[in-house]
Design a protein with these regions (language model features):
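Short, contiguous alpha-helical
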Residues: 42-76, 125-159
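A short, mixed-charge helix-start or loop-turn motif at secondary-structure junctions
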Residues: 2, 78-82, 130
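C-terminal end-helix/capping segment
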Residues: 153-172
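Aromatic-residue-lined binding/catalytic grooves and analogous aromatic/hydrophobic interfacial grooves
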Residues: 3-26, 39, 46-69, 94
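Long, well-ordered alpha-helical segments
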Residues: 20-34, 148, 152
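Acidic interhelical loop/turn segments
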Residues: 31-42, 102-133, 165
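Helix-adjacent hinge/juxtasegments
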Residues: 65-106
Length: 172
């Protein structure tokens, strides 16, 4: 069995972003039910030197849109990091999902050998399209989605594994 670059990337990222929206929705409902200021969750961290929830969402969405653009050879859209409410974070995630859905398989498939260079603080890092997807994008994306889940769970939001995995009959 083989899997295409498109199948291994955009549908996976869209599902992860959809699940992240669900997780944030549960946190928003929890805040309303318990009469907790939602900004408490938006600013929450697992540890003082770790990034807050809001930054986890910024990075997850930036990773997803950057993946689609780089694999397709397109310009990466810039999103200013200004969202500070659950509604604004939902809108950012939806904008990213809509962007990912604007690509079709033909734009992504065949990108396995595309040269991708990331400008990092430590200097440029070079990848092929396949190594970029498998060794950078997917681990980085899921690290930040998982950390968002962990921050909210640690903050008392009633979340379970199916909230993270997306137990809404999308496994086909």
């Amino acid at each position: 069995m083989s899997i295409s670059m498109y199948q291994a990337s955009l549908p996976v990222l869209i599902r992860g972003l959809t699940n992240l929206q669900h997780i944030l929705g549960k946190a928003q409902a929890h805040a309303a039910e318990k009469q907790i200021d939602p900004s408490v969750f938006i600013a929450a961290r697992l540890y003082p030197d770790m990034l807050p929830l809001v930054r986890q969402v910024y990075i997850a969405t930036d990773t997803a849109k950057g993946c689609a653009a780089r694999l397709a050879g397109a310009e990466i859209p810039g999103y200013p990091d200004v969202e500070q409410t659950f509604d604004e974070l939902h809108a950012r995630i939806q904008k990213t999902i809509d962007y990912l859905k604007s690509f079709d398989a033909a734009q992504i498939d065949g990108s396995e050998t595309r040269q991708i260079v990331l400008k990092m603080r430590v200097g440029p890092i070079e990848f092929t399209g396949q190594s970029y997807l498998l060794n950078f994008v997917l681990p980085n994306f899921f690290f930040h989605v998982t950390t968002a889940y962990d921050i909210l769970r640690h903050s008392g939001v009633e979340l379970g594994k199916l909230d993270y995995l997306g137990g809404r009959n999308e496994h086909a």
